UniProtKB/Swiss-Prot annotation:
BP terms from Gene Ontology: arginyl-tRNA aminoacylation
Species: Hahella chejuensis (strain KCTC 2396)
Name of protein: Arginine--tRNA ligase
Encoding gene per record: argS
Subunit structure: Monomer.
Subcellular location, record wording: Cytoplasm
């Protein structure tokens, strides 16, 4: 049950019945303060303005025809015309009993379901994954998991960079090492970052090697069998590096989700031909460009989208247009979500516009750039190693696990080593993921191991610890699979607040799915964890008399189920002991 949506429908209907224009939105939001109710409808002001009517007068008319059944115990008008709704305890109690009995927590599958293509992670296979790939990978995956949970058909597209001039350089270096010593080649490929660096040094310093690298580009593009075989070997090793990172991060991407740049190579000439046929191409100094009036530069000059260089080479824009067309015609997408750095905003908007003008995508297909900010160091600059190098994601995860190990061992010195390592892995990966996911994706954030591993504040360890405390209530009381009888009491203010929070889970997930913002879910789980802490301190559970004891156990079980489900949608594991 989506409580916010239900109230929106009922109050919108009442607005219309009270004389407001049809389709007037109720604008229902959760209230910021308990004295203003559980939800507040703010749509009366806009409707009253359209009717040239006093807002409070219209609000009174709305209340006269509003039928919330047994949902609300009180509805009142506040201020210039806000409608405050106070939910009924009895209604919430009955609703939560239904939530408790349903493995899906009464969250239905969306209908109609959509086909949603999600483009995320997309590392360049010439190098190992670095910290810059973290945001796209984990934010995209959290949204994918949420969309799938809501019943949509999600098609993951890992648009990896496996093509381009840098691969000529890498293949030439592979061949050089192979000729010298096969074992040396295998050792070098174990560290792709160093391999790339060595190849680049040869390219910059050895003219003969540079010529060889350029020849390899030509060979690769012409389909030379030996060259393609060498390239496939490199790509396979590079993808294995990515898969190791995905597994450690509990990211759902697999080899089957890889749709590389090279997959579109054969279609690139067709893209150019179709753009030309539509009259969209302009030759500018030998390059083929699409000029669109809606994209202007500083001097009010129209910015070009270059799709073919003067030397005949294709660009990212050409591949992106081919991918766009594939996602429309083959994958039949209703929505395409691109989890790509905010700095690519102009590029993607140009691609979307060119794709629509060329008829590559239908007008009703939604193209959404889920832009995200940068990961910064303590100095407020892009996160780097101490010597100014790129932070490899694998190294960062290893350090996170090591730091988590030290924290857990410090609190549990007698814990067996195997359990210690398992908890350190879960907490370390969760800390890195949650620290990122809990920030609004459009913002930059400062990476801090100390902050993300803290047991205080909006962190993974805090939420994971809340879950383990709930589980401990049941262990301590030796409460097994009991059949709970009776209603939830909700006598204390914190019990009531928890009931409202638990009933908001559905609308939170729909916000994540529609906006592509997992920080909404993180904020919800943090609030739920904080409220549980207040409940745990102020409301005895196991020592309470019946029926209060059973009521509080039911509330505790609902909290545990919701925390576990919410963390699972973020790709974060729960622990019963920390």
């Amino acid at each position: 049950m989506n409580l916010q949506q239900l109230l929106e429908q009922k109050i919108s209907a009442a607005l219309h019945a009270a004389g407001a224009p049809e389709g007037s939105p109720a604008i229902v939001k959760p209230s910021g303060k308990p004295q203003f109710g559980d939800y507040q409808a703010n749509g009366v002001m806009g409707a009253a303005k359209a009717l040239k009517m006093n807002p409070r007068e219209l609000a009174t008319k709305v209340l006269d025809v509003l039928d919330l059944g047994d949902m609300a115990e009180k509805v009142e008008i506040a201020g210039p015309g806000f409608i405050n709704i106070f939910l009924s305890k009895d209604w919430m109690s009955q609703s939560l009993r239904q939530v408790l009995a349903d493995p899906r927590l009464t969250i239905p599958l969306d209908s109609p379901k959509q086909t949603v293509v999600v483009d995320y992670s997309a590392p360049n296979l010439a190098k190992e994954m670095h910290v810059g790939h973290l945001r796209s990978t984990i934010i995209g995956d959290a949204v994918v998991r949420t969309l799938e949970f809501l019943g949509h058909r999600v098609i993951r597209q890992n648009h990896v960079g496996d093509w381009g001039t840098q691969f000529g350089m890498l293949l030439a270096y592979m061949n050089k090492l192979k000729a010298e010593n096969q074992q040396t080649l295998s050792m070098e490929l174990a560290d792709l970052e160093n391999f790339y660096r060595q190849a680049k040094t040869c390219f910059d310093e050895d003219p003969e090697f540079k010529d060889s690298a350029r020849q390899y580009v030509v060979k690769l593009q012409s389909g030379d069998q030996e060259c393609v075989s060498l390239w496939k070997t490199f790509i396979d090793i590079s993808l294995q590096h990515c898969e190791d990172v995905y597994e450690r991060l509990n990211v759902s991407l697999t080899r089957a989700d890889v749709m590389p740049e090279s997959a579109y190579n054969e279609d690139l000439p067709n893209v150019i031909d179709d753009l030309r046929e539509k009259g969209l191409l302009t030759n500018s100094d030998g390059a083929e460009c699409v000029f669109m009036d809606e994209f202007k530069g500083k001097d009010d000059e129209t910015l070009p989208l270059i799709v073919k260089k003067s030397d005949g080479g294709y660009l990212y824009a050409t591949t992106d247009l081919a991918a766009l067309r594939y996602r429309e015609r083959v994958l039949k997408a209703n929505r395409v979500l691109y989890f790509v750095d905010a700095r690519q905003s102009l590029h993607l908007n140009q691609v979307y516009a060119a794709g629509r003008k060329a008829g590559f995508v239908s007008p009703d297909m939604s193209l959404e750039h889920m832009a995200f900010g940068m990961v910064l160091g303590a100095d407020g600059k892009p996160f780097k190693t101490r010597d100014g190098g790129t932070v490899k994601l694998a190294d960062l995860l290893t350090e996170a696990q090591g730091r988590a190990y030290a924290v857990v061992k410090g609190k549990n010195p007698e814990m067996p080593e195997e359990e210690l390592n398992r908890i350190a892995h879960v907490v370390g990966m969760a800390a890195v993921k949650y620290a990122d996911l809990s920030k609004n994706r459009s913002s930059d954030y400062i990476f801090s191991f100390d902050a993300m591993l803290s047991l205080e504040g909006n962190t993974a360890p805090y939420v994971q610890y809340a879950y383990s405390r709930v589980v401990n209530v049941f262990k301590k009381g030796e409460v097994g699979n009991l059949t709970f009888e009776g209603d939830l009491q909700l006598a204390e203010p914190i019990e009531r607040a928890l009931a409202v929070r638990l009933l908001q889970f559905n609308e939170i997930l729909h916000s994540v799915a529609s906006e592509g913002c997992p920080h909404i879910l993180c904020g919800y789980l943090y609030d739920l964890s904080k409220e549980f802490a207040s409940f745990y301190e102020g409301c005895p559970v196991l020592k309470a008399e019946e029926p209060v004891r059973s009521s509080r156990l039911m509330l505790s079980l609902l909290i545990a189920k919701t925390l576990k489900q919410g963390l699972d949608l973020l790709g974060i594991e729960t622990l019963e002991r920390m």
